[in-house]
Amino acid sequence: QHWSYGLRPGGKRNAKNVIDSFQEIAKEVDQPVEPKCCGCIVHQSHSPLRDLKAALESLIE
């Protein structure tokens, strides 16, 4: 669990808050990546975060 994503260690969690946190992460994953070396925008075609997003979306459905 990572605090920067709104997840808090220990204790009970509200399921809606967890889903909201994962949906926020999914939005960040879909944003294009801007490399610092040049002015072009690169959209990563395969990312472990995309795999995680797909897994979480299948669990939410």
UniProtKB/Swiss-Prot annotation:
The UniProt entry, under InterPro entries, shows: GnRH, Gonadoliberin, Gonadoliberin_I_precursor
The Gene Ontology biological process annotation of the record reads: regulation of follicle-stimulating hormone secretion; regulation of luteinizing hormone secretion
UniProt entry tagged with the keyword Secreted: yes
Q: Can the keyword Metal-binding be found in this entry's annotation?
A: no
Write out the entry's keywords from A to Z: Amidation, Cleavage on pair of basic residues, Hormone, Pyrrolidone carboxylic acid, Secreted
Domain of life, per lineage = Eukaryota
- Give the principal location in a single coarse category: secreted
Localization in the cell: Secreted
Recorded GO cellular component terms are: extracellular space
Residues under site feature: Appears to be essential for biological activity:
3
Positions of post-translational Glycine amide modification: 10
Signal peptide bounds: none
Which pairs are disulfide-linked? Answer: none
This entry's Gene Ontology molecular function terms read:
gonadotropin hormone-releasing hormone activity; gonadotropin-releasing hormone receptor binding
Which positions bear Pyrrolidone carboxylic acid? Answer: 1
Q: Which PROSITE patterns match?
A: GNRH (PS00473)
User: To which protein family does this belong?
Assistant: Belongs to the GnRH family.
Purpose of the protein:
Stimulates the secretion of gonadotropins; it stimulates the secretion of both luteinizing and follicle-stimulating hormones.
Q: What is the name of the protein in this document?
A: Progonadoliberin-1
Specify the species.
Answer: Ovis aries (Sheep)
Gene name per UniProt: GNRH1
